[in-house]
Amino acid sequence: MVDITFGTAKPGETSIVKLNDGIGIMKINLIDTGNFMLDGGAIFGVVPKSLWSQQYKANDQNLCNMAMRSLLVETENRKILVDTGIGKKQDEKFFSYYYLNGQETLEGSLMEQGLTPEDITDVILTHLHFDHCGGAVVYDAAGNLVPAFSNAKYYVSRQQWEWALHPNARERPSYRPENYMPLYEAGCLAFIENDGEFVPGFTLRMFHGHTAGLLVPFLSSAGETLVFVSDLLPFMAHIPLSWVCGYDTRPLLTLQEKEAFLAEALENKYRLLFQHDAYVREGRVVKTEKGFRGVAL
């Protein structure tokens, strides 16, 4: 089992899968929370635009549209949300940097599933970059920052938490304390210490190339495994081994992690669920004469 410790409090469209975990049915929804845009050069790092632009669209300002999907997993007695999108509490100046677009919201997507924020029992944050945890905290009627999911326990890896508290200069703009400190102060934040099973059929594994302690969910049953790849593979276009995101803090480690994961995904025919690819929601890994590649499902 995954080892969890607890923090001490201070004074859109869905893709539905059902997996039988041997105890009950897991209902899995890939839900949309809206889109944002980032520079293609930053997203694809050292890969020349002449190559990546054949695989992913950019506008005349070199901006690529990116989805912000969350994963909703429902079991008999748990409703687990993985990531919360960018949220809506930041000011207009902040949002203007990221060209938000799309009609979907996290609240609206949950409503389409017949759920309210109060129904969520667990919120897993893959990491604490603003586009993954911004919706974890909201303003209440009195203007106080409070957990958006009042009945939920929140989870993040211990390594990511420490990384966010002491960010490096390169990553600092991605960490906004108002997105996660209110969770700690409310006493509802728990820390994942190691890889392991969160609930039956639902395993969390850590990767460290993009950022320290990135949590990646694996959902398995009867020989089928779905992986919500988060920023391990932002787009299907990032599957080729040397196509490493420019935002990754340890690109050589990303290469190692990708090589091992892609070989595993190929051998086991994993279904990959993409969080940021605006055009491909699900895919598989194949091997060609050029190496690992992705095929959309």
Could you describe each region identified by the protein language model?
Residues 4-12, 16-24, 255-257, 262-297:
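C-terminal regulatory/interaction regions
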Residues 19, 87-88, 98, 101-115, 119-131, 146-206, ...:
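Metallo-beta-lactamase
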Residues 56-61, 142-143, 204:
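Short, P/G- and charge-enriched loop/turn segments at secondary-structure junctions
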